[in-house]
Curated annotation (Swiss-Prot):
This is Submaxillary gland androgen-regulated protein 3B. Its main location: secreted. It is found in: Secreted. InterPro entries: SMR-like. It comes from Homo sapiens (Human). Residues 1-22 form the signal peptide.
């Protein structure tokens, strides 16, 4: 019985480290080939519009500061 356990253990260990039917051969380089050049925007082609600065689900950028380093705030209005 001990030899049967030893043989089944070796068989299970070998099954873990040998390629099975579901495994493929070695993988090739990624990407498989050179990428295609981008489409030129010539006559008859219109470039896509730029994405909106903000939209649904996006937070709009903060407004610029009224003054920053080296720029003084405007003087108060005189009556």
């Amino acid at each position: 019985m001990k030899s049967l356990t030893w043989i089944l253990g070796l068989w299970a260990l070998a099954a873990c480290f040998t390629p099975g039917e579901s495994q493929r051969g070695p993988r090739g380089p990624y990407p498989p080939g050179p990428l295609a050049p981008p489409q030129p925007f010539g006559p008859g082609f219109v470039p896509p519009p730029p994405p909106p600065p903000y939209g649904p689900g996006r937070i709009p950028p903060p407004p610029p500061a009224p003054y920053g380093p080296g720029i003084f705030p405007p003087p108060p209005p005189q009556p």
